[in-house]
Regions:
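An acidic, low-aromatic, low-complexity terminal/linker signal
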Residues: 1-160
Length: 160
């Protein structure tokens, strides 16, 4: 949430996407999400962690696709007809081997423009692996996912 875009002299506004996942909502700065695409079944690979669903081709590049729920140690439920893939810009993608990865989401994200008083850290929520911070927005609760750790773990996988 560090990336604040000045829109005028009085306010700092951060355009974000609230992304529905099973049983929760994630919030990410707009610039973190490269694209939301229709779900396509990933090509499965052997010897992958259970949270890695496989790889898809996106804009001529193979990218890994993960289940956020499984990554966090939660049971991944039935994939409904509204599922999509959020293509995420890897945090260190500009200088690393992994530029993008996909995350299965449960519907269409909504755009919100956050001003600092509109978002508060929720210290009453116990965080699990994959969660950097729990926040309370004017529209409810959301989780800031830990994309840096996800990227590190994806880079450690032998894709051969």
């Amino acid at each position: 949430m560090q990336q604040i875009a000045k829109t005028n002299e009085q306010s700092d506004v951060l355009p974000c996407l609230v992304i529905p996942v099973q049983g929760s909502r994630l919030i990410l700065p707009n610039v973190t999400v490269a694209e939301i695409i229709a779900f396509q079944r990933p090509n499965e690979s052997e010897n992958m962690p259970s949270w890695v669903l496989g790889q898809i081709e996106w804009r001529g590049t193979l990218i890994p696709v993960i289940s956020y729920e499984s990554y966090c140690g939660q049971k991944s439920g039935v994939m409904g007809q509204d599922i999509r893939i959020a293509v995420i810009n890897a945090p260190n993608g500009d200088k690393g081997a992994l530029r993008f990865f996909g995350m299965v989401v449960q519907g269409i994200p909504s755009l919100v423009k956050l001003e600092e008083p509109a978002i508060q850290e929720n210290l009453n929520t116990s965080l699990v692996k994959g969660q950097k911070m729990a926040v309370t927005l004017e529209t409810g609760h959301a989780i800031v996912p830990d994309l840096d750790v996800m990227e590190e773990e994806l880079l450690a996988i032998d894709w051969q």
